[in-house]
């Protein structure tokens, strides 16, 4: 297949490009940044520009994997309009381009944040979207577009609701796993909110890529929850990071954020019935991430 990967120069994107090329797909990257390797066909531009979308998604394209997005919850709260333009308007331009060319397969990186605060309820695909942040709202809005394009134009739109993605190559990310790795590598303390018993699901990056490959092969509309299938507390994440790095990472306990959810528990069974099988548990995933940080440096958050 000829697959266009938007955001292909990013964290998940680089892994997706490598996996798709390894299985024999012809890959075109569309990104604001050049791809690290000149051997990859990378079109540099802004997906909010209709002209660039036409150049990136050219005739002969078989599928689009749409990973490009602004994913910062903080930025979405500061400038929701800019995030809406990138996460929703650009998505609609891509869908329209696919409709014009007859490209039916469209896989999208969504988020479990579309569900919002569900209390003690386990999050699965049946939970109605009730996002609490502008970022979550943009992903939910994109999912509504997919539903409409699937019903109206018979497009095989697949929304993958990722949990917290981590892994090799995340040096510039400002997520808790990346911060833990930087603390272990260069010193400094990790901030832990409240008692540290808030629980989250952390999924290794190559497991999300496996889900992308499943999505490309479905040939029908679908929404899937993609995670490790096991939620861990911040304390367990911190302690496991200390164990795999061999560093006693100091922790600063600070007041909990207002409105922070005590637990995010997801059910990945629907994806598992389609062949999804996470290969990394937390210790193995953190060990692989640490190995990459040691080999390539800690980088810094943007």
What does each of the following model-derived ranges do?
Residues 68-71, 110-111:
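Conserved NAD(P)H cofactor-binding loop of Rossmann-fold oxidoreductase domains
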Residues 78-93, 100, 105, 114-159, ...:
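Catalytic helix-loop patch of NAD(P)-dependent Rossmann-fold dehydrogenases
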Residues 3-22:
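N-terminal Rossmann NAD(P)H-binding glycine-rich loop of SDR-like oxidoreductase domains
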Residues 41-63:
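Conserved Rossmann-fold cofactor-binding substructure of NAD(P)-dependent oxidoreductases
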Residues 184-302:
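C-terminal substrate-binding subdomain of Rossmann-fold SDR/epimerase-dehydratase oxidoreductases
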Residues 25-36:
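Conserved glycine-rich Rossmann-like NAD(P)H-binding loop of the short-chain dehydrogenase/reductase
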